[in-house]
Amino acid sequence: MVEIEIEPHEEFEGVYWAIFEDGRKKPATENLVPGHQVYGERLVEYDGKEYRVWEPRRSKLAAMIMNGMEYFPFEEGSKVLYLGAAAGTTPSHVSDIIKESGVEYCVEFASRMMQELIPVCEKRPNMIPILGDATKPHGYAPLVEQVDVIYQDIAQPKQAEVVADNAEAFLRPGGYVIVAIKARSIDVTKEPEEVFEDEERKLEERGFEVLEVIDLEPYERDHVGIVAEYHG
């Protein structure tokens, strides 16, 4: 059996490194629901606790961590709005980090994905599944309180506008957004760098201070993660 060691991340609360025998490492989180996997991820017992290896090819947030992310606004007790929750892969790791005292509103538009997301949420009391359209935040406004962080991973053209509209509705002043930007979803005719700069500018025009832009290569092609603070 391959021995895997677990060490806390140098800076990020609730994030760990799973260190393999050959020296490779991947992010990990302590499992809020021991014994349960979400997407076939590896479970590791270490010092009496169970950890879930966080696969960067399955999660853009894990890819950001692998690629040197500097700002990580999640912590125990955080209130999070997750736009584009899909089947719950990344949201489940966020759930591990914010623990029982946090809450994560998981908005997903596709009913087929929702069928996969709901069983994940049923096992994790801090995850609330919401069938909704991220472009129409008023549709789920009665269900969502003010949050500390908005994480967005949606493949559609107006990504900066969507996260800004949601921030106006739900994000506390001084809160943070993390946006996974896919250039080809926004404009296939432009170079990715140009698309990313356009999205940064749109965020700044809507009251955000962009803190960092993280290239997601080699895990995702033509993607970046943008972390920004909201000043309203």
From Swiss-Prot:
Gene3D superfamilies xrefs: Phosphorylase Kinase, domain 1, Vaccinia Virus protein VP39
Keywords, sorted A to Z: Methyltransferase, RNA-binding, rRNA processing, Transferase, tRNA processing
InterPro entries per the UniProt record, alphabetical: Fibrillarin, Fibrillarin_CS, SAM-dependent_MTases_sf
Domain of life: Archaea
Entry GO MF terms: histone H2AQ104 methyltransferase activity; RNA binding; rRNA methyltransferase activity
UniProt record, GO biological process: box C/D sno(s)RNA 3'-end processing; tRNA processing
Chain residues that bind S-adenosyl-L-methionine: T89, T90, E108, F109, D133, A134, D153, I154, A155, Q156
Signal peptide: none
Subunit composition and interactions: Interacts with nop5. Component of box C/D small ribonucleoprotein (sRNP) particles that contain rpl7ae, FlpA and nop5, plus a guide RNA.
HAMAP family reported for this sequence: RNA_methyltransf_FlpA
Family the entry assigns: Belongs to the methyltransferase superfamily. Fibrillarin family.
UniProt protein name: Fibrillarin-like rRNA/tRNA 2'-O-methyltransferase
Species of provenance: Methanopyrus kandleri (strain AV19 / DSM 6324 / JCM 9639 / NBRC 100938)
